[in-house]
Amino acid sequence: PLLKLVRSRIVWLLVLAVSAILTVKVLDSFESVLEQAVVLSLFIPLLTGTGGNTGNQAATTVTRALALGDVRKSDVLQVMWREMRVGMLLGATLGILGFIIASLVYDVHIGIVIGTTLLGICTLSATVGGVMPILAKVVGADPAVFSNPFISTFCDAAGLIIYFFIARAVLGL
């Protein structure tokens, strides 16, 4: 039984470990932005962690609903719409808090970058997190094993892209 559990998990973890290179490539492509505003690097763990947590909460909720029969594969659009709105509200709340703290500790421009990024990351992560268990079920994968690692990997890379595009626009980098 132990090796069977390992086999059921290792394939996805290996695929995702390799795909995590995407996150490294994103950071590499925005190296000049980080060099011009080093303070941005301090917020990376907060932003990627928030994205992963938001997406994983949504995935866990939907995975449970799938297991209980409260959600079916055909409900994907309704789930996507609901989780997008939940993510926006969570992102707005966390974004306001992030804006206030970053503005007080650094400056208002950094606050705008952090607040806006939290809104975008939470919206995207909740949407992806809500849809991923359903897609996993459609392709015959176990949503409980596949969803959370994929969400974390995807949201890290996508969240950093959102972050650096917003930073470039707001800070003029």
Regions found by a protein language model. Name each.
Residues 9, 13, 29, 53, ...:
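Conserved, well-folded catalytic cores of nucleic-acid-processing
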Residues 1-17, 73-92, 111, 115:
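Soluble-to-membrane junctions at the N-terminal ends of transmembrane alpha-helices
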Residues 1-44:
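Cytosolic regulatory modules rich in charged/polar residues
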Residues 28-39, 103-110, 165-173:
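Helix-coil boundary and interhelical linker segments in multi-pass alpha-helical membrane proteins
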Residues 8, 52-56, 82, 155-158:
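Residue-level micro-sites within transmembrane alpha helices that shape
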Residues 12-20, 43, 47, 51, ...:
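Alpha-helical transmembrane segments in multi-pass membrane proteins
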Residues 5, 79, 110-111, 144-149, ...:
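Alpha-helical transmembrane segments and their helix-entry boundary regions
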Residues 30-39, 54-79, 129-152, 167:
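Juxtamembrane helix-loop transition segments at the membrane interface in multi-pass membrane proteins
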